[in-house]
């Protein structure tokens, strides 16, 4: 199993991956798919469907250098042609582990991961401020 596929396995175990065409379609329509992965030997129809899922969104779709059987083996299935990773940081780590030059996708995911990090910091600061002030009270 390659490094990239290890990240897919880890994402599945952490609940950060959607596997198969219907779940990937649902998560991308909801705008929550950071990275859509398509196996190298997946059909043209599957590739077109994946591209249509992310069309008009800021989600990234790539073909990875792994077969359906290799992707399936990584997550404990027979075969897997399409998957989506929902966490930008996990998607970024996986993309960095994959061979090949994917500069545009890396930049997009880096921006998404930075936005998520900033949002989490703001949420933490807000929660800390609410605790210090004793919470919101009605008069």
Model region roles, listed by residue range:
Residues 3-38:
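N-terminal first-folded block
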